[in-house]
Amino acid sequence: MKSFNHLIIHFRTYGLKHKFLYSASIMLFFWTIFDGIISYISPLVIISSGYSNTMMGIIIGTSSIAGALFDFLLSKYLQNSHWRRLYLIMFIVCLIQPLILWQSKVAVIYLLAMAMWGLYYDLLGFGNFDFVSREMETDEHASSFGVLGVFKSLGYLLAPLIVGLVIGEMLDWKPFVLALVFLSMSFIFFLILYINGKKRGIRIERLQQYRPKGFLVEINLWKKIGKVMLPFLIFTMLMSMQDSFFWTIGPILSETFVKFKPLDGLFLTAYSLPPLLVGWFIDKFKGTFGRKANYISFIISSLFLITFAIFRHPLILLFVILLSSTFSTFSWAIEQGLYADYIEDSFSKEKEIEGLVDFSVNAGYVVGPILAGFLSDKVGYFNTFAFLGIFSFFVTLILSRIAPKRVAIGG
């Protein structure tokens, strides 16, 4: 998770040497606005078809199940595919998915739309990885991924605000057309990348460094590493659940802020702002709270969420969301740093650690929407966030007590 300060440092270090990377970043920026619009309107579209919040949560949760399945299949069959092919397939799927979502009326078609959502997101991830590994020098990989991450965060920041301007009293064709406009803008930059990439020729020949160890061996490694890292993996799942709550029922709650129209998208914009800013303060925060900083910050974030049971005024809630998101972002950033340290200490287990982390994230994005939908049917949208805060508070408190001071995975 990189903030604006990373982009400034990267540009000072490399300047215009990375024009190709900046073109890819702009492509990703417009694509992320497209995806942010789809993320925002998906729960609204499903609810408008007469489905309950619980059913809506189940439908959205299937996108992460499909994503996990496609992640396995793509890693198995598209290991050496070029980023040009991966991005091109992604754009084709992205073009079809909103059209299916727009015309969906029955659950089966919604499930198909969610599966395509999971597919194109995985294609983007594989495309980004291949792009950086082929086009950037090895010692520039981490910084290059950081630049892509900044533009991605910026897109998700603006998407709710932009789509909120075109959603009226009824959800019609306008948000879908708007999403496709930004997808088209992204595709233009892809064409520029495609043409310039052909001219550049082969920059870096990718080597297959990872050899699968066999299914049973992998399962045993997952069990061994997962047992040691269990508190951290549960914590990652919890953070993913919180994020999915905001993107599942946040758009619906935003539409209840009548006084804010047409700026009701500010709800998720306030939630998406901190990831772009906390980079300047993360080291100081860690220095203040020490090795438990990730848990302490999430406990504070959860306490702010509990106040949803009390406050109803949109301006107060925006401030609460901003503060809660700020502290949860600290937790995300610190947790990612911990995983990076574990990988550095046990480099031969890199793929297994990454696989377990991805599994925890996917699990959070499956359980989160289902739980968010169910609770909002039972206790309402505001109390759902309050319940999330209470649940997160106690789980994080327990994890902070049982988490080991040091994780020894072995070489």
Language model features with spans:
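Juxtamembrane intracellular "pre-TM" segments in multi-pass secondary transporters
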Residues: 2-18, 197-232
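Helix-to-loop junctions at the C-terminal end of transmembrane segments
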Residues: 70-82, 167, 278-290, 376
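Structural signature of the two symmetry-related core transmembrane helices
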Residues: 85-99, 180, 292-307
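Cytoplasmic helix-loop-helix junction between adjacent transmembrane helices
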Residues: 117-151
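Central cavity-lining transmembrane alpha-helices of secondary-active solute carriers
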Residues: 58-74, 269-281
